[in-house]
Amino acid sequence: QAFVVKGILRTYTVDEKGSEHILQFASEGWWVADLSSYLTGEPSVFNIEALEDAELLLLSKSSWDELMQAIPKFEHYFRILIQNHLIATQKRLLQSLTETAEEKYLKFTKSYPECIQRVPQHMIASYIGVSRETLSRLRKLRSIGK
């Protein structure tokens, strides 16, 4: 796991056709990891990339296990963090299934305001599951107040 001290990162995967699919952006104050790989030791199916200069605090699995044993409040903190991650994942899945492109973009701008100027537009489009052209149209409509 890594704690983002400075910078912004993305977690993504690449499908068989070579298309990237972004699952998460993580900026200052966020934790980033492939939790499944981290906890099971299996190879990750995700890539994590810094989108700008970044400073991270890395926590190895063995250090994580030691901290969990030694400091009960640390275990409580991570339990809450993982619960919140599960809730966010469920909300994102529901959003991808039920919301329009405009609704997804508006929620993105409210949930991740720090990303708007720091993340390339094609990556934001990938995250919300729309084409670059659709995102451009949404941004234009929003800028003229429609």
Descriptions of predicted regions:
Residues 63-64, 74, 78, 83-89, ...:
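Alpha-helical bundle regulatory/interaction domains
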Residues 17-20:
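Short alpha-helix-to-loop micro-motif enriched in aromatics/charged/Gly
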Residues 22-79:
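Cyclic-nucleotide recognition modules
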Residues 1-4, 55, 95-98:
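Localized chelating/binding microdomains
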Residues 99-146:
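Phosphate-/nucleic-acid-contacting segments
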Residues 3-12, 28-29:
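Glycine- and acidic-residue-biased ligand/ion/polar-headgroup-sensing regions
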Residues 3, 22, 47, 85, ...:
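Residue-level recognition of specific faces of alpha-helices
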Residues 12, 34-35, 66-67, 108, ...:
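Residues that scaffold the ATP/ADP-binding catalytic core of kinase and kinase-like folds
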